[in-house]
Amino acid sequence: MGKIIGITGGIASGKSTVTNFLRQQGFQVVDADAVVHQLQKPGGRLFEALVQHFGQEIILENGELNRPLLASLIFSNPDEREWSKQIQGEIIREELATLREQLAQTEEIFFMDIPLLFEQDYSDWFAETWLVYVDRDAQVERLMKRDQLSKDEAESRLAAQWPLEKKKDLASQVLDNNGNQNQLLNQVHILLEGGRQDDRD
């Protein structure tokens, strides 16, 4: 059974810098967002569940989901929002569990990048959880720059997620990304070396 490490963060906290680096080092990293994207493609399990529930009107002429329409149907109705959260949560969890079991057979150590790791109770899946952390002010600034948002828009997006301060208390390792990229990746190096040392002990 391989050692499984969960990675999480917040919008614009620098998580992709860490996961890209881990892939360059030869590690397998499961990307929960990419899994969801696949599931929402025509023929995917989420696609089928959504069409069965909402009907053919949510399919565009090219066969893809009409995401703006879907979002308005879900977010304008609390019952639909609850249904969506539950059904999507179940299907995504099942798919991630299958990937986890497959990789555990072949990998000594691997990672799973799950944005809502703590919010959706994935903690007990992992030997360790790594949080890519950044101060709130820096997070707002980076998000404004990355997505060309106003300060209010950036604040509003961040308000929809748990604050990183809260996640900091739950993570087993905190990667501080308030400095530059080299400082961040140096912390990853140290954790990887520590993990290899633990495996040898």
UniProtKB/Swiss-Prot annotation:
<comment type="similarity">
    <text>Belongs to the CoaE family.</text>
</comment>
<feature type="binding site">
    <location>
        <begin position="12"/>
        <end position="17"/>
    </location>
    <ligand>
        <name>ATP</name>
    </ligand>
</feature>
<keyword id="KW-0418">Kinase</keyword>
<dbReference type="GO" id="GO:0005737">
    <property type="term" value="C:cytoplasm"/>
</dbReference>
<comment type="pathway">
    <text>Cofactor biosynthesis; coenzyme A biosynthesis; CoA from (R)-pantothenate: step 5/5.</text>
</comment>
<keyword id="KW-0173">Coenzyme A biosynthesis</keyword>
<dbReference type="InterPro" id="IPR027417">
    <property type="entry name" value="P-loop_NTPase"/>
</dbReference>
<dbReference type="InterPro" id="IPR001977">
    <property type="entry name" value="Depp_CoAkinase"/>
</dbReference>
<feature type="domain" description="DPCK">
    <location>
        <begin position="4"/>
        <end position="201"/>
    </location>
</feature>
<dbReference type="GO" id="GO:0004140">
    <property type="term" value="F:dephospho-CoA kinase activity"/>
</dbReference>
<protein>
    <recommendedName>
        <fullName>Dephospho-CoA kinase</fullName>
        <ecNumber>2.7.1.24</ecNumber>
    </recommendedName>
</protein>
<dbReference type="GO" id="GO:0005524">
    <property type="term" value="F:ATP binding"/>
</dbReference>
<keyword id="KW-0963">Cytoplasm</keyword>
<keyword id="KW-0067">ATP-binding</keyword>
<keyword id="KW-0547">Nucleotide-binding</keyword>
<comment type="function">
    <text>Catalyzes the phosphorylation of the 3'-hydroxyl group of dephosphocoenzyme A to form coenzyme A.</text>
</comment>
<keyword id="KW-0808">Transferase</keyword>
<dbReference type="GO" id="GO:0015937">
    <property type="term" value="P:coenzyme A biosynthetic process"/>
</dbReference>
<dbReference type="Pfam" id="PF01121">
    <property type="entry name" value="CoaE"/>
</dbReference>
